Amino acid sequence: MESSGDKQTSSLYPTVDTSNPEAPINPSSSSSTNNLYPSLDMNDLARNLFPEQPETSSIPVSAPPAATEEVILKISGAILHLIDKSYSVELACGDLEIIRIVQGENVVAVLASVSDEIQWPLTKDENSVKVDESHYFFTLRPTKEISHDSSDEEDGDGGKNTNEMLNYGLTIASKGQEHLLVELEKILEDYSSFSVQEVSEEAKEAGEKVLDVTVARETSPVELTGERKEIVERQCSAYWTTLAPNVEDYSGKAAKLIATGSGHLIKGILWCGDVTMDRLIWGNGFMKRRLSKAEKESEVHPDTLKRIRRVKRMTKMTESVANSILSGVLKVSGFFTSSVANTKVGKKFFSLLPGEVILASLDGFNKVCDAVEVAGRNVMSTSSTVTTELVDHKYGGKAAEATNEGLDAAGYALGTAWVAFKIRKAINPKSVLKPSTLAKTAIRSAASQKKA
């Protein structure tokens, strides 16, 4: 028979000592070691009524979605010219890359780059044209002239020529790359105002070698070296200079149609495939002579130098926006950034749907660039890869002087984390876009158009 003491220790209930009723109850006493109910500290409960969620507390609410850069197409053997009727200057030679910047689930911007030297955005109000199997040209409005830029002061136009178009002529050594050109044209259809315009057969026959497309078409990227490269480059320069009046005329008319929302361009209405005889004579003469450095310098018109400066600004602007997005400086969500929504951007912005390119207009791209530049004008750094010596060797001192003006054509990168941090402070990610702001801007735009 068990003793009464054994019954007490095996009891399910704690033993209460009644010998001293005024003594405090000790919750940690040995009598409660077998208690089925857990002990609770009321102080802990009071302090942790709303515990933090560890999986979300470390992420700030205003953090922008991650941005990534994707190379969706790469074509070797690309030569890029600045189309000019006095002398088309070669800007870059190397690989053509089409780069897509994605932030979250949205395609924020699509950029074209040649040899990592010249970049420009592909946008829905930018004209891209296929002329033949190896030649394409792109039309861009140059960025807003900056009043404090020394190159503007030397221009003497006070920024009045900011609406003058930049026309880039792209030549591709297309032998063996025909399938890549098909992909390129699909991308241009998706992200720009793409059309196909051809030179008339009469002009091709009269132009002899100057408009001959077989030189580039029958050259592969591997063969684009040495003497063969010089032949192709000379032919490309003559080709684009000969077609310059046609390209400039078409670009001006096409830009007006795109700005008014006229949609796709109809072949034959704007493009004049016939090349004037004086242009053909000039082009054929150019093909027959080899220009020395001094002769090249004499061919560069002062207006061409101004356009070269605008090319540099276009590259700077494109890299500024791209690096700002990738650095988390610029958060894009929904349709547009607030810097775009708060300006008079025009009705074409508001016809876009979610999922399309957010920076779908070059106007929008320019305004985003302005916001980035204001925030980080004094902290951004420049990295140069195109040297004055190279340009001086190819095009003479005047072109080299233009290349040395302002920021270099090849470099405008943020580069360091502290720079990105400073600009992130200046542009508040919380105020990226308010739907009410977008709606009010759309209403004001529609009202102004109705009054007009």
Curated annotation (Swiss-Prot):
Keywords annotated in UniProt: Chloroplast, Plastid, Transit peptide
Induction record: Diurnally oscillating levels. Induced by abscisic acid (ABA). Regulated indirectly by CAMTA1, probably via a DREB/ERF pathway. Accumulates during dehydration stress.
Subcellular location(s) of the protein: Plastid, Chloroplast
Region Disordered, annotated ranges: 1-37
GO cellular component annotations of the record: chloroplast; plasma membrane
Stretch forming the transit peptide: 1-28
Low complexity bias (residue ranges): 19-37
Superkingdom, natural source: Eukaryota
Protein name: Protein EARLY-RESPONSIVE TO DEHYDRATION 7, chloroplastic
UniProt organism field: Arabidopsis thaliana (Mouse-ear cress)
Lineage, highest ranks first: Eukaryota, Viridiplantae, Streptophyta, Embryophyta, Tracheophyta
